[in-house]
Structure formats: structure tokens, C-alpha cells
From Swiss-Prot:
Pfam families for this protein: Hexapep_GlmU (PF24894), NTP_transferase (PF00483)
Function according to Swiss-Prot or TrEMBL: Involved in the biosynthesis of ADP-glucose, a building block required for the elongation reactions to produce glycogen. Catalyzes the reaction between ATP and alpha-D-glucose 1-phosphate (G1P) to produce pyrophosphate and ADP-Glc.
Species: Bifidobacterium adolescentis (strain ATCC 15703 / DSM 20083 / NCTC 11814 / E194a)
EC main group: transferase
Protein name according to UniProt: Glucose-1-phosphate adenylyltransferase
Quaternary state and interactors: Homotetramer.
Length: 414
């Protein structure tokens, strides 16, 4: 392996995101807004850029128009240096079908990898919120002699059926003894029986070994063509799979609170909870770390504005993230995230909620513990999140935890 190996990054952005419906009704999961001004895709791409990896392809599939547009608009690099972030839709190069799984997605674009001729391929998911220096993972991958390395993070054993579960070789702590994808039952870690080492869905692979594994998987009958379900176990069975402990990853500017923060936001509850992590005085995930920034398009929006300071009508926001272009005009916002161009009118109230771009909350309307998609309008005196039965009767989604989700463009008039 060369001292400075050539790296190609691949972002797997083809998932439907059905568990995030209705937020994914009109957009791909990686295009879902997050944290006020970002989209989920901005987090893995920012991590790759901050790691120094400037050649990236993003494999897209379902409802990818807004995702493709965002990547093409925001993630433009100078071609003079050979740098790029390139969205690649499903090519159907090997048959008239969509990607059959994450491994098949890479196999169907193997011509792109062959054109670049990298020594190592870094493969990451597109729908997690975290900071990570992939150079540190690549360095350990090279030093360990593994052909394929999986990033791991501790998670509660009760969630083992949601993750790939890694068993580490006790004699070689950087190598994987076995890998099970979403097992119904498993054993905990030796030092913590209530935890597992879960796959983060991030991989580093030697190119030749990856090609060989993908070629075998494509021909196999007993396969789901999945990186976690098929490719990782293949390398583990051959004693060629390494494991990288995410907890050892050091990020400039990280705080003790948000060190090794990682969240899967694949469900509405996880998506909501990850937003709530952003807005405390000492946030669990600090969006304001300028030493490892999360990049996106800033836009030409004016600053947020707060107006009306009367005794009975005070425009204010507390414990909240308020994006550019927002006007809080005599309303109250608490413990919430407001995306650009939101309007909060007099005597209205927004509490414990996430409002996407262009939402309008008119006078005396109330929003509690809700996610409002783009361009939702609450008319005067209307409510969301106050009466669960009423919300369900209007066709809104209400999670078991009581989070109400209103689809894009809805006018709430009662």
C-alpha cells in the first residue's frame, strides 16, 4: 500500500426512508432538512471534505431531484484540482432494475471506481448526524492489514435488531471475529453486558478486495446484496475484517459533551430527538464548532428579526435555533428549531417543535411537540399537537411518543 494512498469516497444515498414518512413523501431521505439550515447529506459530505477527501460520488435513487439539485448547487468544487462531489443516479447498467441493495449499488457503478483507480474506497451512509475524521479510520485500516474495516459504536443491547452487531476478536482487538446483521438476540460486550458494538454503516476497503467481494455477491443466490448483511460478514468469515472504534476518533473543537456523538435519524422519533440534542445550553451535538464545520448553502437571506415588545405581545425565542430570514412578530418560541423564512405571528406559540422552511404560524395559533414540513400554514387560532385525536382525524401522523408530523404544504385551518 502506498504511503499516501489514493482515496475515492462513496456516499450511499439511495434509501427510501419509509420510516420518516411523510417527510420523505416528496424527497429522498438524505435531502430531508435538519438543524435549521442543513440537509442530512451535508453531514457525511462535510466529514469527508474536512478529512481531506475531495473526490466523492453520491449514489442516489428514489425521489432524488431535490437531493441532486442540492448537491449540484452546494457541493461545487474547482475542477482545476480534480475535486468533485458527483451525484450518480441508478444506472441500470446490469439489468432493468433499481439497486437491489447497498452492495449492488456500488457494483453497478464499478466502472466509476475503475476510472478513478483508487487504492482505497471509503464508503459512508447519507443519513446519520455526527462528526468523524475518516483519515484516522483509514490510517488504522492500513496499519491493521485488514482488507475491509467497519466503524463501530457502542449502543444498547435492546437495539441490536436495528444494527449490524460486531464481535471483536479478543486476541486481535482491531479485527472482527463475527458480524451479524440486525440479529433478534445477541450477547453483550464482555465489559458491558447491556451494550453491543454496532456498525455505523461506514466502511473502508482495499479496492481489489472490494471488487472481488462484490463480484461474488452479485453471482450469489442467497444474498440481499447489502454491505452490512453480506459484504461485512464475508470479510469477517475470512478473518480479513477490521473494526474501528468511533470513540477513539478525535475531532478539532469537539467538547466532552459531543465527543463521539452519532445519531441514526431513520425514524421520526430519532429525527425529533436529534434536533432536541442541538438546542440546550451545552448541546449534545454542537453545530457551532468552527474547527470542523458542517457546510451548506448559506443563501442570501437577511438576519432573523424579533419584533413587538409590548406587555401583552412580546416577540421572543428561548432555548431555540432560529435561522436566517425568520421573523418572530409578537409570538412565543421555546425549545424549538426554526428553519429559514419561518413566520411566527402575534400571540402564537411554538413549543418543543421543528419547523421547516417557509412555515407560517398565524395569530393565536399553537404548535406543540410537532414537526411541520415546508410551507405548512397554520391559520388564526388553529392548533397542532394539542389534541391527538383531532390531529389523527385531519390525517396527520402522530408517533407513539406523541410527536405530530404535518406534511409539506398543508393548510391547517381548524
Amino acid at each position: 500500500m502506498a504511503k499516501n494512498p489514493k482515496i475515492l469516497s462513496i456516499v450511499l444515498a439511495g434509501g427510501e426512508g419509509t420510516r420518516l414518512m411523510p417527510l420523505t413523501r416528496d424527497r429522498a431521505k438524505p435531502a430531508v432538512p435538519f438543524g435549521g439550515v442543513f440537509r442530512l447529506i451535508d453531514f457525511p459530505l462535510s466529514n469527508l471534505v474536512n478529512s481531506g477527501y475531495m473526490q466523492t460520488v453520491v449514489l442516489t435513487q428514489y425521489k432524488s431531484h431535490s437531493l441532486d439539485r442540492h448537491i449540484s448547487t452546494v457541493w461545487r468544487f474547482s475542477p482545476l484540482l480534480g475535486n468533485y462531489v458527483s451525484p450518480v443516479p441508478a444506472q441500470q447498467r446490469l439489468g432493468k432494475h433499481w439497486y437491489l441493495g447497498s452492495a449492488d449499488a456500488i457494483y453497478q457503478t464499478i466502472n466509476i471506481i475503475e476510472d478513478v483507480q483508487p487504492d482505497i474506497v471509503v464508503i459512508v451512509g447519507a443519513d446519520h448526524v455526527y462528526r468523524m475524521d475518516f483519515q484516522q479510520m483509514v490510517q488504522q485500516h492500513i496499519e491493521s492489514g485488514a482488507e475491509f474495516t467497519v466503524a463501530g459504536i457502542r449502543q444498547p443491547i435492546s437495539q441490536s435488531n436495528q444494527f449490524g452487531v460486531i464481535e471483536v476478536d479478543p486476541d486481535h482487538p482491531n479485527m472482527i471475529k463475527s458480524f451479524q446483521e440486525k440479529p433478534q438476540t445477541t450477547t453483550g460486550l464482555p465489559d458491558d453486558p447491556n451494550s453491543i458494538l454496532a456498525s455505523m454503516g461506514n466502511y473502508v476497503a482495499n479496492t481489489d478486495a472490494l471488487f472481488a467481494a462484490l463480484s461474488l455477491d452479485e453471482k450469489a443466490e442467497d444474498t440481499k446484496h447489502d454491505m452490512g448483511g453480506d459484504i461485512a460478514p464475508y470479510f469477517a468469515a475470512r478473518n480479513e475484517a477490521g473494526v474501528y472504534d468511533f470513540n477513539s476518533n478525535e475531532i478539532p473543537g469537539a467538547t466532552p459533551t459531543d465527543h463521539a456523538y452519532w445519531r441514526d435519524v431513520g425514524t421520526l422519533k430519532q429525527f425529533y430527538d436529534a434536533h432536541m440534542d442541538l438546542i440546550s445550553y451545552v448541546p449534545e451535538f454542537n453545530l457551532y464548532n468552527t474547527e470542523w464545520p458542517i457546510y451548506t448553502l448559506s443563501g442570501n437571506l437577511p438576519p432573523a428579526k424579533f419584533v413587538h415588545a409590548g406587555r401583552d405581545r412580546l416577540g421572543h425565542a428561548t432555548d431555540s435555533i432560529v435561522s436566517p430570514g425568520v421573523i418572530v412578530s409578537g409570538g412565543e418560541v421555546h425549545h424549538s428549531v426554526l428553519s429559514p423564512n419561518v413566520r411566527i405571528h402575534s400571540w402564537s406559540q411554538v413549543v418543543d417543535s421543528i419547523l421547516f422552511d417557509g412555515v407560517v404560524v398565524n395569530r393565536r395559533a399553537r404548535v406543540y411537540k410537532a414537526i411541520l414540513d415546508k410551507n405548512v400554514v397554520l391559520t388564526e387560532n388553529s392548533t397542532v399537537g394539542i389534541d391527538t385525536e383531532h390531529d389523527l382525524a385531519r390525517g396527520f401522523t402522530v408517533t407513539p411518543e406523541g410527536i405530530t408530523v404535518v406534511p409539506k404544504g398543508t393548510v391547517v385551518d381548524d
